[in-house]
Amino acid sequence: MSVPLDDLGEAHGFDVIVDEVSSLDAKAKSVILKSGATLEGFDKIIIAMGHHKVQIKGMKEHTLSICGAPEEAVELHTRLDALIQKGGGKLAFGFGGNPKDRSSVRGGPAFEVMFNVHNYLKKRKLRDKFELTFFAPMQRPGEKMEEKAHVMMDKMLGMTNIDKKIGKKIVSFESDGIIFEDGEKLVSDLTMFISAGKGHNILESSKLPLSEAGYVVTNEYNEVEGFEGIYAIGDSAMLLGENDWKAKQGHVAEVMARNVAHNILNPDDKLSYIDHLNILCVMDIGNGAAFVYRSNTSAKMIPLPIIGHWMKKGWGWYCKNSKLGRIPRLPGL
């Protein structure tokens, strides 16, 4: 699913400038672009630049991600098809961590790709020609989803004959595999890896208050205190809250964006994003899905055979068309 920015701008009445930010001076409310243009004179600036990835030696050269440039996802498909033409191979799927901010881990998409590839190969009657391995540096990957979900995920790995290598720090990536801190090498013909996030590099010189992981520190209204008219949302902002399961997800970013728009227009009736902090996703596995939800008061993982896959595809259609104003948004979404 993709939404052209020009179409989005036309639907909602804002101008689109396609350029790269070279620097941001929050005090001066000045943004310098790679083209040399300067954006200044604005009363409000909302920082929604996403984040950068924690770098590991060889990651750029020897891995592909579905949480990066769109071209990487296309290349992943191309290289998988090449291995199919070759007759088989060893595939590795994993994600990384950031001990400075656990909310920046992207685990769900890695599981989705892995299980979808498993079912793709199974449909083509080639699953026995491939070795699939899941890897991650933490001892209990997926535990944010809560204990029962973690156990269910482990069972799914066993049922689909997917090996795992967990609990060991990733030292480097090579053209033919992954090296771990204990010296062991996981051999791989194709490695899909989603690195954990860290604050965007541009923010380092912005003079804004940053967390240890480099994210902008805001209050619950996404205001940067001490910087009037500056807001940070989504992956650019540090998530507040003491719970260790919180995660940076798209629906939380949307709540932040909606709240900031409301708060700018209604300064005496501000909305907080704190009560909306939860984990919510439909994890597509190719022949079905799993509904995952966790909050301070509830945690569940519900299998959705067959229908779950189509629910996920349907959500993509709804998401695109509702954002373009072609259909109404569902209440609360």
Where are the predicted features?
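Short loop/edge segments at beta-strand edges and connector loops
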Residues: 17-20, 25-26, 136, 164-168, ...
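C-terminal, flexible cofactor-proximal segment of oxidoreductases
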Residues: 259-333
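A conserved FAD-binding loop/helix module that cradles the flavin
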Residues: 105-107, 233-285
